[in-house]
A protein has these predicted regions:
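Terminal leader/tail segments of proteins
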Residues: 1-70
Length: 70
């Protein structure tokens, strides 16, 4: 398992200032951790959002989806 910060590539902000992280598991699953809560998951190339969240967390989810869904 590796944990790294979600970079802001598609979002207009320069950074998410350490509030959004990606957990990359060895089996290929990835999870988005926003404010210490798992809010999205990628399995087999598809992103699943695990609920509705604040505007900022929604930005994290959109960025995560644009970067990792194929």
């Amino acid at each position: 398992m590796k944990i790294f910060e979600l970079p802001a590539i598609y979002d207009s902000r320069k950074s998410f200032y350490g509030k959004a992280h990606i957990i990359d598991y060895e089996n290929g699953t990835m999870e988005l951790l926003s404010y210490n809560t798992i809010v999205s998951r990628v399995v087999n190339g598809k992103v699943k959002h695990l609920g509705k969240w604040s505007a900022t967390t929604s930005r994290h989810q959109k960025e995560f989806q644009k970067q990792f869904e194929y």
